[in-house]
């Protein structure tokens, strides 16, 4: 397979015009079981909308403490579950922490219920039982039968708009619920504020502000129905507030066109004929309700669901056809599903007019590039962005420009560490943007100013208050008393510094090159020659006692242990091999890993 893959990569330009339906090999359901943390719903390559079902809504806290079960729902969907609460428009894929789950929509019929019910008793609320036998997940398309209300739910998407199609039974009590309370990694105070405006009997707009992994996040929306609703209403679950003003003069619970609060659910009522399809277009914007509506009108001007679905599949086929593999069918499923997952993030983060909200919370315009967000760089700098330099060079160029825009807007003057939705959540370790920038510049992908990029790398790497960098600069390592991840931080900073050195060398900055090459050797300060492993070191330069190479707790490593992190010296493998006793001992050690 490797031989065929390399051959195909070399001949991508020659196969581009003979597109195959490679999307047929994509199985988005892969990764949704146990701890895969992927979602099965509809999205397009690098899309801002990820329209997917939530199989439960688990609170981040329980009895005032962290609820471990919430981790199972990083992507909102768990294959083992048997109920669906609704379909929301934003999701993270493959992460070990989470956020999002904005604007949950659920069709129902019969008696109106405004609470979601429970997994053990779905009929006590608006959620529904479902079966995987009646579920289809494809690239750009999702379908499921909602058993309790006999409704067929279908989803597709464009870059900034999700499209729903609900096939109802005959009923004079059909409803579509919009839950503005629901969210992934949710907790009672996560919603800072929500606002909804009913523009007419088929269009509503609004926004939601949340304080989660991204601490200041606002998402605007426009929601359009293919059929006029006959009535609507809302329920406000806010705790009693000290001041509510004089809005009590109105009955805001039914047919009132302007609603605001922290904990809101809305409903829209319809009469439906047997097998009648009611469609919903749901557009997002980081900037304004007006922009969300503009995104909707630009990307899905009509109501042809099948056309949008076919367009989404065509977009996936365009990307998947960049690599051809000659292997058996099962391997093709694994390969193209993995390729599909690789092309979900980073996500588009600007409107069709180029506007986006920057890290400074001001509105900016992406001039000459697409602005991207969702940079999980600790996870992606090693392989994903180098991969993009080969088969997504234009996009990776835009991604680097997005990182530079992030730096320019940063109050701390730092490149992104883990950014999404105009926030940096500072998750994981290292300053791995510098690796992505350096690789793109040296390979000729980045079309921006390399001198400015180098300065951004230097400034980021010298932010002394961030995660032990001051100690790292002064002592050549981070004392274990100062950080619970002191060793992994030191190792990752050392690699990043080597990247900065290579960029400085390309730009003929000799003094910078020498400084950062010296810093790139700091890994040696955590290498214990007596045992051949990386080991936490105290401020007095003695190695930490009670050392366990297998343990992942209190040993100075993040999501790892000394056994796997001791091999992380990609900038100087020859010296690492020497320190571990030569090639034979090194190979033997690898074999026992």
How would you name each of these model-derived features?
Residues 19-385, 389-435, 441-491, 499-525, ...:
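Accessory carbohydrate-recognition regions in carbohydrate-active enzymes
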Residues 1-20:
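Bacterial Sec-dependent N-terminal signal peptides
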Residues 496:
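ATP-dependent phospho-/nucleotidyl transfer catalytic cores
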């Amino acid at each position: 397979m490797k031989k065929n893959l390399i051959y195909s990569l070399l001949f991508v330009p020659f196969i581009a015009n003979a597109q195959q339906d490679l999307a047929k090999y994509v199985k988005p359901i892969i990764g949704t079981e146990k701890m895969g943390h992927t979602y099965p719903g509809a999205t397009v390559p690098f899309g801002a909308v990820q329209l997917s079902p939530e199989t439960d809504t688990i609170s981040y806290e329980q009895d005032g403490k962290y609820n471990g079960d919430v981790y199972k729902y990083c992507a909102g969907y768990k294959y083992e579950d048997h109920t669906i609460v609704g379909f929301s428009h934003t999701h993270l894929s493959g992460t070990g922490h989470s956020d999002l789950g904005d604007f949950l929509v659920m069709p129902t019929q019969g008696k109106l219920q405004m609470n979601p019910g429970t997994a053990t008793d779905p009929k006590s609320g608006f959620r529904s039982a479902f079966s995987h036998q009646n579920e289809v997940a494809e690239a750009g398309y999702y379908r499921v039968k909602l058993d309790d209300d006999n409704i067929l739910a279908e989803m597709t998407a464009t870059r900034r708009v999700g499209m729903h199609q609900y096939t109802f039974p005959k009923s004079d009590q059909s409803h579509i619920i919009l839950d503005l309370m629901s969210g992934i990694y949710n907790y009672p105070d996560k919603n800072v504020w929500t606002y909804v405006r009913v523009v007419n009997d088929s269009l509503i707009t609004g926004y939601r502000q949340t304080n989660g992994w991204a601490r200041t996040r606002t998402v605007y929306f426009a929601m359009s129905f293919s059929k006029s609703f006959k009535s609507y209403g809302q329920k406000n679950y806010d705790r009693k507030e000290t001041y509510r003003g004089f809005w009590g003069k109105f009955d805001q619970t039914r047919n009132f066109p302007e609603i605001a609060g922290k904990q809101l659910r809305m409903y829209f009522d319809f009469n439906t004929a047997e097998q009648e399809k009611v469609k919903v277009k749901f557009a997002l914007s980081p900037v304004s309700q007006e922009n969300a509506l503009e995104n909707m009108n630009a990307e899905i001007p009509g109501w042809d669901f099948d056309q949008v679905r076919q367009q989404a599949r065509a977009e996936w086929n365009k990307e998947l056809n960049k690599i051809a593999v000659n292997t058996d069918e099962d391997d093709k499923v694994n390969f193209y599903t993995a390729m599909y997952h690789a092309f979900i993030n980073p996500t588009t983060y600007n409107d069709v007019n180029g506007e986006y909200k920057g890290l400074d919370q001001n509105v900016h315009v992406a001039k000459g590039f697409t602005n991207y967000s969702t940079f999980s760089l600790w996870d992606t700098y090693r392989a994903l962005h180098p991969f993009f330099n080969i088969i997504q060079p234009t996009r990776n160029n835009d991604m680097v420009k997005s990182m530079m825009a992030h730096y320019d807007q940063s109050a701390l003057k730092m490149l992104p560490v883990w950014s999404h939705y105009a926030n940096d959540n500072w998750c994981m370790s290292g300053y791995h943007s510098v690796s992505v920038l350096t690789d793109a510049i040296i390979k000729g992908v980045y079309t921006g100013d390399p001198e400015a990029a180098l300065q951004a790398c230097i400034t980021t790497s010298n932010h002394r208050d961030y995660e032990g960098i001051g100690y790292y600069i002064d002592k050549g390592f981070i004392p274990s008393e100062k950080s619970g991840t002191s060793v992994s931080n030191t190792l990752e900073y050392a690699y990043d510094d080597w990247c900065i050195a290579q960029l400085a060398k390309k730009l003929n900055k000799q003094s910078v090159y020498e400084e950062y090459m010296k810093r790139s050797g700091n890994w040696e300060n955590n290498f214990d020659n007596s045992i051949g492993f990386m080991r936490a070191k105290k401020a007095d330069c003695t190695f930490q006692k009670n050392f366990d190479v297998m343990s992942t707790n209190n040993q100075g490593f993040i999501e790892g242990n000394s056994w796997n992190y001791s091999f992380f010296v990609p900038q100087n493998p020859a010296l690492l091999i020497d320190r571990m006793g030569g090639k034979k001992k090194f190979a033997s050690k690898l074999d026992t890993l």
